[in-house]
Amino acid sequence: MTTDLTDRRRLILKLAIQEFIESSQPVASDLLVRKYRLNVSPATVRNELAALEELGYLTHLHTSAGRVPTDAGYRYFVENLMDRTPLSATEQRTIRHQFYQVRSELDQWIQLAGAVLARTAQNASVVTPPRAQQARLKHLELIAIHETTALMVLVLHDGTIRQQTLTLDVAMTQEELSRCAAQINERCCDAPVERIEEVLKQERAQEPPGGNALVCQVLDLVVKAMHQFNEHISSDIHSDGLIEILNQPEFSRVERVRRMVEILQSGRALGTLIPRALSSSGVQVVIGGEHSYDEMREYSVVLSRYGGGEIVGVLGVIGPTRMAYPRAISAVRYISAVMSDLLAELYGIEGANRLNSEP
């Protein structure tokens, strides 16, 4: 929605959304006039609230005369109205100190990021470990075990090692296996899975019919392993902060608590958002009905990638659409910058979200 609003309507919409975020109660015109000392009458504010409702930014509950924001209202607020306030200097120092105390322990980074995000944003948090954005083949070895059995050792660009036993159609010597591995390494080194699929297709089209059977068999297993790795990137999600989100009034009903626990534990719906964050720069905000999964349409997610180059991860917060967006965005932005700096300093990875570039 791109409707231009008058300055007065922008102010009233901003105040109405801020008030609802703070109180969780529908917002009435007389409250806005009294609390924010507006130089207009409650009747005038009431008319403006009605106009904003007609435009789709607000709605009202049948049991109350007050208004509440719609997803479109929250979107307009995030993009045009909210105050962008960074975390305080004290908070930044504390967070940075906590991370540098555990900077040599990657697993502790992930746990700490989840805990700090949840506490700072007062919502649940999600974090994925830093990984290659997409699996690339670094090296392949084939090791003879028995005449018709071999071990495939697959090394990916980020150092991940996959091993799998192959049952061969015919007996093979170590020399023959090594030649096959060398051929694949020459053609597929540093290649993503899409390129290896092309090589497999080309090999199958060669003479004799089906090409080199061993090469095709190995390439097929490589493709499957790399697809599994890429899928794992989107599903390896650490979550924290359930206790924080349960303090929100939206979770007074058991059924809603159950749905949130399922979202955090299964990772299926959240996993669909990870590729979007990995391929985007800056902080991404997905609000309510903008989600493709129905079970996510009562929630908002604030995400950012961290790291840089080939090695990146994603972190963010999830909560009800009545989220303190400025606070959540500031927390996600700052912590992603801290983790990018850690990756850059400790592993020689140039961070995309550096602290010195934060606005």
Swiss-Prot record:
Q: Coiled coil where? A: none
Source organism, top-level taxon = Bacteria
The biological processes this protein is annotated with in GO are: negative regulation of DNA-templated transcription
MF terms from GO for this chain are: DNA binding
- Kindly give the SUPFAM superfamilies that the UniProt entry links to this protein: GAF domain-like (SSF55781), Winged helix' DNA-binding domain (SSF46785)
Sorted alphabetically, which keywords does the UniProt record give? Repressor, Stress response, Transcription, Transcription regulation
Task: Provide the function of this protein.
Answer: Negative regulator of class I heat shock genes (grpE-dnaK-dnaJ and groELS operons). Prevents heat-shock induction of these operons.
- Say which family it is in: Belongs to the HrcA family.
Task: Supply the PANTHER family for this chain.
Answer: HEAT-INDUCIBLE TRANSCRIPTION REPRESSOR HRCA (PTHR34824:SF1)
Supply the NCBIfam families for this chain: hrcA
Query: What's this protein's name?
Result: Heat-inducible transcription repressor HrcA
**Which gene name belongs to this protein?**
hrcA
